[in-house]
């Protein structure tokens, strides 16, 4: 089980999420359920550079897209950037992008190799 830490910068309408350790599907499901019951921002930055996603399966990623679609109306038009640390995490994040498109999740998702690229795409300035 991994660790997910969440920080908010409400002036920038930004949530920064950092995942570390060996992640399982329930880590993400629990975070998603908790997030959408609380403070929701228009832009979200996921930092998974120190996360190990090797336990996740394609079905887990598809299920995440379905679960998120049912909860995410409040983020319509928003953006989520995922910063990855290696080829596995980048590929899985790209797969998540595709599943979110298929499920018509109401916000954009894109994977990046650096936080700077992600923040630029999110439109967040220091």
Model-derived regions: residue spans:
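Amphipathic, Lys/Arg-enriched alpha-helical "gate/interface" segment within cytosolic domains
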Residues: 2-126
